[in-house]
Amino acid sequence: MPKGAYTTTRTFNSGSHIFLWDFHLNRVTQSLLLLAEAHPELFPNLPPSLLTDLLSTIYEAQGEEVRHEEGQENETQMRDTRRARNMVAGLQKEIRDSVLVAVRAMVECDWWRREAEGEQKEEQQQQQQQVEVCLMILLCGQGAAGGAVSGEPAASGAVTCEPAASAGTAGTAIATPLLQGVEVYVHASTVRTTPLASLALPPPICAAVMGPGRHTPLAKFSSWPLVRRALETAKPAEARDVILSTDGNALLEGITTNLFIVARTEPASDTSHGPPWRGYELQTASLESGILPGSIRQAIIDACGERGIPIRIQAPQWSERATWVEAFVTNALSIVQPVSSMLMPATWPSDIGYDSWQSVDKWLTWQAPTLEENYGSRSTFLLEHVIGHMTFRSAELQDLLTTDD
């Protein structure tokens, strides 16, 4: 995959909605600007002098306060801010148009038509699954893809769109002033998933704690899948996910997920009666600790605020695992995935690196207290809220397809 900023999302309700569209649009834009700041060689045509204003525009769109130095908000500053807003709006319009090209190509191909017309309806009903579109949006420097993608639908139903300059398709390459040289690629494929209305917690998995954390945590960098491969190869056979840590105590996130822990704040005897969250809190790492801001992570944090659930935005500590009663990881595909056990190296490597795990042969184990009354009820409660959050804050695909501005 070419080096650049990317995000992945999917549809739900049989392709009628795109999951948390505004979140993913802002995240891939922010990732592009952060990568351009950290790795200017990837985007040589993005002027460094504009990156601060462009990032401020994204933070404002996400509802974050942007502070200016005293006396700085003068006419020049206001003009630069307006310019940055227009540039971000133009960039995001190009991303949106590229997504629509990919979705249209997907739904017009014969393979998708057969799915939609129900040729595999009986099989899907038996599996209680729906066919959805999985979208990957990639922003990279001009020519970074090296012609490695094609505009032709693949037999499996995958569609990859080329930039406009090479494929002649409008809306698939950035043409905004001062953002020239950034190309938009969208890959659309199909995924079978359980309908939201009948979604339940999947069987729990085991996760291994390894590390270190991401080098560019706030940006979704396309080189990460290659970097994480060393961890996936070296993890114990029973582990389905890897939880990242830099020091062997603070747990940051999974390699494709965010991590949550339900922990006791009072002795177990004091929490046996009363509301389900009495004497408990939810824990997840902060963005400042070096994690990628996930869409489901944010939905769960919002749920805690709306429902009065105690939450500590701080990396869960392995040394406090005696207080843990539930654990789960989240992402856009699995939504909420319970974790029943975690493995930790008995000795944390002194020279930590992504390729330093082959020699680890002894692991400590945390096992979830499955005999606790109502085990899993708090994770289920949060899953139900997230489903409602997804439905309320996601974009109707038809609205995007019919919007021309």
Predicted regions and their residues:
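Signature of the catalytic double-stranded beta-helix
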Residues: R85-E119, Q129-V131
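Long, low-complexity Q/N-rich tracts
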Residues: Q124-Q128
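Extended, Lys/Arg-enriched charged tracts that mediate electrostatic binding to polyanionic substrates
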Residues: Q130-M136, G146
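Helix-start/capping segments and mature chain N-termini
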Residues: M1-R82, D97-V101, E117-E123, C140-D405
